[in-house]
Amino acid sequence: YDSSDSLALLDGIVDIYMPDMKYSNEVIARKYSKIPDYPRINRMALHEMSRQVGDLQLDEIGIAFRGLLVRHLVLPNDLAGSKEILRFLAEEISPNTYLNLMDQYRPCYQAGQFPELNRRVTHEEFLEVYQLAKQFGLYRLDR
């Protein structure tokens, strides 16, 4: 993940940022990805990216030319903490944030060691996150 210090060096250079928001909970991030302090650093990075490029802008034929496009992979059993991620985007970044909600999680590698992570996301779980995004006022949703 990117630190806000390294991102500051890119100010004025990058036109489009496409970060992932993987987890909203530090304990979960550490457990499954061994990423210490992920939520805090990820949020700081998104604030910096948003400051630099703002909401995603499209030209007259629908091609993005500047802005922020956030990706979020929905995990089974809400292990990503999707509600908090959606709240953060809507309230602290912008309700105009372009959000790609992804349901293509497939358990592989060491996922079998974690029964709660060792299955695909159900259609119902994905729809719940999609509806939550709309409830938070996020409307630029892509799947």
PLM regions and their residue ranges:
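Conserved AdoMet/S-adenosylmethionine-binding subsite of the radical SAM
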Residues: 1-115
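Generic hydrophobic secondary-structure packing signal
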Residues: 38-41, 125, 129
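Short amphipathic alpha-helical segment that frequently serves as the phosphate-/nucleotide-binding helix
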Residues: 83-86, 123, 127
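Gly/Pro-rich active-site loop or hairpin
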Residues: 112-124
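A cross-taxonomic marker for long C-terminal extensions/tails that follow the last structured domain
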Residues: 127-143
